Amino acid sequence: METYPKAKRHLEYVAFFDFELSTMEGPAHVFLAVDAYSQFAFNLGVEPDKKPESVLKNIYFLTENEEFVRYMENGFTLVLGEYEELSDRINAIIRPVNGKLLFSKSFNSYLSNPVLISFRDSLMHRKRKE
């Protein structure tokens, strides 16, 4: 079993990820981030696609989020499981605000899975009530 670093402060590691929902208009990609230390989930936006512009826009939205800004003076590491081809453009967004970039699919999954499982469980619970 792989071991991962344990966050010792807010925003030390922040997983950025998305999941797809089906809608009447077609797929919708929900972009989220989660702070490994607090487990706080940032709801960044919903886009019709995962094009580079959509990904970059939502990373920018993260750096402007009020809760995120509150803790970013000590820097942050953005953990992504994909989008390596956008690394230069992502760094252009996060470096000026004291951010670093880490690509690790397994670490990203480790950090994001609790949020995704909680979301799934919430939907299933809601469905059972109907």
Q: Where are the regions a protein language model picked out?
A:
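Short active-site oxyanion
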Residues: 73-77
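Active-site beta-loop-alpha junctions of metal-dependent nucleic acid enzymes
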Residues: 44-70
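RNase H-like two-metal-ion nuclease catalytic core shared by retroviral integrases
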Residues: 78-82, 87-130
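Mobile-element integrase/transposase regions
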Residues: 1-30
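Short His-Asn-centered micro-motif
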Residues: 16-17, 34, 80-83
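Short, glycine-anchored, charge-dense loop/turn motifs used at functional sites
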Residues: 37-40
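Short acidic, S/G/P-rich loop/turn micro-motifs used as interaction or catalytic elements
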Residues: 20-24, 48-50, 83-87
